[in-house]
């Protein structure tokens, strides 16, 4: 299915890249000393779904084939171990040459002198092709410290049979027709009343490190986490209170399972497959796993996130970065360019069901391996993320804010902390993080 240029670029951005499959030259085999055991080896550390792991393995092999004598040491680790491992290795001087990092965490590394400045390694033909807001997300003080590798976003998957049983006959088929918060509430109430038993209306994907996805609701009210200086808190506002009160009502109205709270260990895709919820907010990268889990047991479709004064979504996806410790910096940078070359990015996105970050690929006929009929919904939803949203989520101290959101939202949703105290707690934490 084609992903239109208008859809993916309209929100995020306000030449084609060089293709490296047929031979990657220009790097030196005599790079500086560092963590790798060989200057002809690229160590690449990442987490990965099964589909992503397959794509990474295939592309690593292709890079080796294109560069005689070069080895890619691909190290796939669980997401929960990824950044504690990277941090320990950076401290000990044994960091991988290249690693994967999500956009909200990017600023933590780019601001600390731990990553390779890619200014002299990326030409304008490539950098001009990146979706501007995503390229902005990998920069610090105007310099690029990574390459946007892919992006993903959240939409709602739902079970038509459950909707039919609850008497819900109309589902949004465009961003313009997306449910308002009031309409979404009515749908949730109807599902709760009609389905009965142990089936609940939905679950949201804000668990653990996904706590930042709560900001979607804040942005939809027209609110902000940070002022325009990107350091001062802006969340103590009528918009902040509205977003917090609405999302707290998910628990008060028993629309979502309690074990899917922000610090919960149960994720929406898991219980959607088990048919314990009618709807699940999920990222497009989960479509292969959902399809494998559901098989032909029931029909499932996708629709858009609800909206308030505006539509919004989360900044999903990941960048690839090279470390300052890389044993051969030129080779590490060449590997990054290879991974985001147009043909390679396209094949990776197709296999893992993710969205490209190159403008030249937006609108191309990407042959998605799983549920290509649903991908355009996610692509259109991704256009609702603005450059201002991205700027607030990619500050150097956002990693601390994400932990803060986990704590404060859990206190509000589960432990009875007031909306006012929660907003104040987030604001105080933002001030501490920005000042630290």
Residue ranges and their predicted role:
Residues 27, 143-149, 154, 180-233, ...:
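Extracytoplasmic/periplasmic solute-binding protein
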Residues 61, 65-66, 166, 252-255, ...:
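Extracytoplasmic/periplasmic substrate-recognition and gating elements
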Residues 76-85, 104, 178-183, 260-273:
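Short helix-initiation/N-cap motifs at beta->coil->alpha
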Residues 119-130, 173-177, 200-204, 223-242, ...:
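Short, solvent-exposed loop/beta-turn-alpha elements that line the ligand-binding surface or hinge
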Residues 187-189, 229-261, 305:
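Glycine-centered hinge/linker elements that transmit conformational signals in sensory
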């Amino acid at each position: 299915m084609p992903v239109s240029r208008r859809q993916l670029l309209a929100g995020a951005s306000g030449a084609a890249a060089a293709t490296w499959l047929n031979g990657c030259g220009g790097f030196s085999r005599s790079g500086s000393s560092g963590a790798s055991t060989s200057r002809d080896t690229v160590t690449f550390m990442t987490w990965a779904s099964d589909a992503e792991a397959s794509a990474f393995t295939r592309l690593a092999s292709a890079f080796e084939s294109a560069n005689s004598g070069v080895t890619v040491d691909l190290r796939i680790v669980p997401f929960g171990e990824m950044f504690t491992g990277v941090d320990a290795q950076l401290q000990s001087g044994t960091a991988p040459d290249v690693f994967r990092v999500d956009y909200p965490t990017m600023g933590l590394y780019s601001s600390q002198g731990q990553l390779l400045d890619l200014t002299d390694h990326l030409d304008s033909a490539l950098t001009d092709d990146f979706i501007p807001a995503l390229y902005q997300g990998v920069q610090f003080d105007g310099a690029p410290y990574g390459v946007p590798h892919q992006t993903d976003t959240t939409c709602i998957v739902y079970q038509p049979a459950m909707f039919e049983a609850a008497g819900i006959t109309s589902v949004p088929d465009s961003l313009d027709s997306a449910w308002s918060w009031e309409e979404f509430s009515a749908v949730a109430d109807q599902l709760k009343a009609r389905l009965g038993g142990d089936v609940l209306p939905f679950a949201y994907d804000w668990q653990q490190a996904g706590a930042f996805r709560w900001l979607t609701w804040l942005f939809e009210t027209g609110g902000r986490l940070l002022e325009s200086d990107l350091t001062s808190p802006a969340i103590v506002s009528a918009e902040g209170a509205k977003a917090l009160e609405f999302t707290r009502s998910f628990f008060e109205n028993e629309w979502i399972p309690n074990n899917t709270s922000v610090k919960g260990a149960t994720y929406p895709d898991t219980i959607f497959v088990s048919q314990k919820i009618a709807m699940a907010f999920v990222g497009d990268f989960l479509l292969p796993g959902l399809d494998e889990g559901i098989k032909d047991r029931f029909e499932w479709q996708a629709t858009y996130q609800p909206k308030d004064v505006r539509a919004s979504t989360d900044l999903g996806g990941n960048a690839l970065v090279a470390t300052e410790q890389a044993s051969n910096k030129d080779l590490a940078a060449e590997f990054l360019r290879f991974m985001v070359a147009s043909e390679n990015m396209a094949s990776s996105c197709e296999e893992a069901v993710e969205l490209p970050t190159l403008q030249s690929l937006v609108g191309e006929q990407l042959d998605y391996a799983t549920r290509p009929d649903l991908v355009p919904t996610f692509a259109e939803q991704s256009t609702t993320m603005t450059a201002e949203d991205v700027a607030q989520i990619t500050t150097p101290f956002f990693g601390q804010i994400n932990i803060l959101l986990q704590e404060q939202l859990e206190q509000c949703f589960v432990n009875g902390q007031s909306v006012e105290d929660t907003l104040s707690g987030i604001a105080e934490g933002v001030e501490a993080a920005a000042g630290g």
